[in-house]
Amino acid sequence: MFGKFGDSNLNLSPTLGYARAMDIRAIRIHEYGGPEVLKFESVDIPEPGEGEALIRHTAIGLNFIDTYHRTGLYPLDLPLSLGTEAAGVVESIGPGVGDVSPGDRVVYTGLPLGAYSTARIYPADRLVPIPDGITDEDAAAVLLKGLTAWYLLRRSYPVKSGDTVLLYAAAGGVGSIAAQWARHLGATVIGVVSTDEKADRGRDKGCAHIIMSDNADIALTVKELTGGKGVAAVYDSCLLYTSDAADERSSVDLGGRRI
């Protein structure tokens, strides 16, 4: 998902930096909790320092991990600005920056947090140029989830044609990308979801089979779907697969992996 931020038509004084010419605002929290703790506040940021760039955001990515930061499941020092992913335009750069220039369209993901803002300072060497033909909204919505899917399918276990894989949360952000990608690689995807609506979405994204997460014996169902062979890889982001280690091993093919 993504949200829009920023004003692409803002006219800046030639004698003032962007950070000084605009009221920069950010979604911040001063305590952990539900959505009610989110505050849209004015913030002061400096001009970019050594190796840094000032980014005017045009779109921000929304990720499930943001709720972990907001609720304190992953505790961080307060107060803080939320958000791990955004796209925008480079407004100015600090000393020693050579990879990006003012006016470049870029996207980023990762620490430090602070993507829920109209503009921010960010390490220039972590900025990714947005190719022509890719919108800022698409870039902001898929970078973190796309990189995660890439790592799962190409590094954790290199999926190949003929493989069968078990994918949890198959209708989520990462799952939607991973299901399509795995099918493109020639794999058969068994998706695990929690609702009928998500089941339809999982099938639409490339899952050949769907298992509901309240299934009493997912491992047995996997064995039945694979003719007793098991899957090449289990991608379990929910840690719901099975508490029975013997069942788990029996539904993963020889040499397969649980990730």
Over which residues does each language-model region extend?
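Intrinsic-disorder-associated, low-complexity terminal segments enriched in Asp/Asn/His/Tyr and depleted
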Residues: 7-11
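Short, positively charged and aromatic/hydrophobic N-terminal segments
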Residues: 15-18
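Glycine-rich beta-strand-centered segment in the early N-terminal region that forms part
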Residues: 44-61, 71-114
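NAD(P)H dinucleotide-binding glycine-rich loop of Rossmann-like/cofactor-binding domains
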Residues: 68, 106-171
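Mid-domain Rossmann-like dinucleotide-binding core that forms the NAD(H)/NADP(H) cofactor-binding site
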Residues: 143-216, 220-221
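N-terminal Rossmann-like NAD(P) cofactor-binding module of classical short-chain dehydrogenase/reductase
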Residues: 235
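Conserved small/polar residues in nucleotide/adenosyl-binding loops
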Residues: 241-248
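Hydrophobic alpha-helical segments, chiefly the membrane-spanning helices
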Residues: 253-259
